């Protein structure tokens, strides 16, 4: 529960088991009810941030991490919670939270890039979210990095997310492990693929493991180039970075920073402030609430 100043009054978390729409709606409903009970204040509306393409009000077109297509999540949640629901892309929500009460305070033009399980970005231009004609603008994770390349959860091939998103970094690390191609990865995860994380991949690359270095370097290069190109196109006042992968993989983050310095347009990066997201995991929920 968030007030109009962006302060969290109460919070509740619930572990997500089954990922079908009804199960997710019920999980969110239980967590929301607990947060409302803890806050003890009236709530006018509900904001929901989802890692999904949301081309129309309340409808998810594609949610790669959940395997969803064409799900009216907004209407389902409104029926469950009995309150108006605004459904927005998770990075749009995070960008709005950072703009209002985080690292973007006082700025009018932001580029927000998060790398976690996937790759996402959001754009604030002249103080407003830039979402495009179909509501799916700023989908950095789904620009084509390697046309015809690795399969992405969105159903297409060669997306940036398929190379640099956390889930896909782990998938590539597991492929190396299965082929016996990375002794360092095998040692770091005790030969258990289920234990692999992007941090293991970066550590193996740091140790000089050839195949881990190849995968990590490709991800870093593609991500850095994509962010640098966005800086050139958008000329933001601030670039805000966040997400678990960038937070816990400093080598990847450093490559992004170097890429912006080396490859973005000189005039576009003049005066650019590069900042870490201030609100951490709360940026999306605060932003979604403030947008509701």
Where would I find each of the regions flagged by the language model?
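Gly/Thr-rich phosphate-binding beta-strand-loop-beta motif of the actin/hexokinase/Hsp70
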Residues: 1-10, 111-127
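A charged helix-plus-loop insertion that forms the helical arch/lid used to bind
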Residues: 60-69
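Short beta-strand-to-turn element immediately C-terminal to the catalytic PLP-Schiff-base lysine
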Residues: 2-3, 97-98, 122-126, 130-132, ...
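ATP-binding/phosphotransfer module of carbohydrate and carboxylate kinases, centering on a glycine-rich
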Residues: 1-45, 54-57, 75-85, 100-107, ...
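Generic enzyme active-site microenvironment
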Residues: 88, 96
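Active-site glycine-centered loops adjacent to acidic/histidine catalytic or metal-binding residues
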Residues: 90, 116, 288
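A short acidic/small-residue loop/turn micro-motif
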Residues: 15-18, 68, 137-139
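Short hydrophobic alpha-helix segments
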Residues: 12-14, 64, 133
């Amino acid at each position: 529960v968030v007030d109009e100043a962006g302060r969290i009054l109460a919070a509740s978390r619930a572990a997500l088991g089954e990922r079908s729409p009804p199960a997710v709606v019920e999980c969110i409903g239980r967590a929301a009810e607990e947060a409302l009970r803890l806050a003890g204040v009236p709530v006018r509306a509900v904001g929901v941030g989802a890692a999904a393409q949301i081309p129309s009000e309340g409808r998810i077109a594609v949610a790669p991490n959940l395997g969803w297509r064409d799900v009216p999540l907004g209407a389902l949640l409104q029926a469950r919670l009995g309150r108006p629901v605004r459904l927005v892309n998770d990075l749009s929500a995070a960008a709005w939270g950072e703009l209002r009460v985080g690292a973007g305070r006082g700025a009018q033009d932001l580029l927000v890039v998060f790398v976690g399980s996937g790759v996402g970005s959001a754009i604030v231009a002249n103080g407003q979210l830039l979402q495009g004609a179909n509501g799916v603008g700023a989908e950095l994770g789904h620009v084509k990095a390697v046309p015809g390349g690795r399969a992405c959860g969105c159903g297409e091939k060669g997306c940036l997310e398929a190379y640099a998103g956390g889930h896909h970094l782990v998938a590539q690390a597991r492929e190396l492990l299965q082929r016996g191609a990375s002794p360092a990865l095998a040692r770091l995860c005790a030969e258990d693929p289920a234990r692999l994380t992007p941090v293991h991949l970066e550590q193996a690359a740091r140790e000089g493991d050839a195949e881990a270095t190849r995968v990590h370097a490709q991800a870093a290069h593609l991500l850095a180039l994509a962010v640098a190109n966005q800086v050139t196109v958008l000329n933001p006042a601030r670039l805000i970075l966040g997400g678990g992968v960038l937070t816990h993989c400093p080598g990847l983050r450093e490559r992004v920073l170097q890429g912006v310095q080396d490859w973005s347009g000189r005039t576009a990066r003049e005066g650019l402030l590069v900042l870490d997201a201030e609100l951490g995991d709360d940026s999306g929920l605060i932003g979604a609430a403030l947008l509701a």
